[in-house]
Amino acid sequence: MLLNTNFDPHDKSSCTLTYEQDAQWLQAVWRGYVDPAEAMRGAQAYLQHAAQFPCAFFLNDNSQLTGPWFESLDWLAHVWVPRAVQLGLRFVAHVVPADQHYDVLTSQLLQGQQVPFELQVFQELADARHWLQQAQQANPALQSAPGLRAD
């Protein structure tokens, strides 16, 4: 189910957020060169929709991303992460860009820090999906299909 799309008509970059009903997780797919403002909008869209669709599992797919992923690491670490956890995030499968074996998230944000959810980094989307499925099987109490909240 499509929840949000941010699209830049100038360079065709985008961030699409969906709730994958069969898999029961939120998924963000980033494409192209995402500038800092676009990255912030995409991250904020996740928080907005996670409030309506609380979900413990998140697949963050950067495999089609070019360039740096996120420049505001301080905001990500001190605002996004705590809010996402408050909204129920417990497992994140993070797929790095195809031309890289690491990215800013794994090399800088988490350097020496404990994150309050389980984070695994993958080079292949299929491996990330498989890991999230295993996490769901190991944590069946967290695997309930979210519904719209009437806040």
Where are these regions (language model features)?
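Amphipathic, Lys/Arg-enriched alpha-helical "gate/interface" segment within cytosolic domains
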Residues: 2-151
